[in-house]
Amino acid sequence: MMAEAGKEQEIVLKGHMGTHFDVMDKEFPLSYCVLPAVLFDVTSVPADREITAEDIDTSLLRKGCFAGFCSGFSERVPYGSRAYHKEHPQLSYDLIDLLLDCGVSLIAVDFAGLRRGKEHTPADQRCADRGAFVIENLYGMSRVPKDVTALTAYTFPIRLIGSSGLPCRVVLGSD
């Protein structure tokens, strides 16, 4: 138990707590601080299957946009719990590739990552290699009114020297 707690503390000290993104081997471009945004309500996707392109309106995706996925998971499952890290929703690899093919700059989820377990880091690296960052644990997307269609995402990372994760603040505003 102590070894597991030590591992969790090490992860937190490297910037992987709360809303953050994994730096991978890239640098966050300042041009990503303000982006047009689209939110996808995926609360109706059953927990026993991946979120796929069929679950969203892909025509809303634009090159250089912020794509947020609101599953409601972070509001139902306690942050930091075993279930939060092991049972969260996942985006299918086909959907991840579609987002990257569309040129999405930021992919935000209200859960612990695009993929679970051993697939988490490779999925983040896949995005980073294509110029996209993944914002994890973005709480509160469900508060954005469903009828708001023109959104801007303001994303402000907090630089931590030597960290592999950057805590960030994200504000979604309507145009």
Functional labels for PLM-detected ranges:
Residues 1-175:
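Active-/binding-site microenvironments in catalytic and ligand-binding cores
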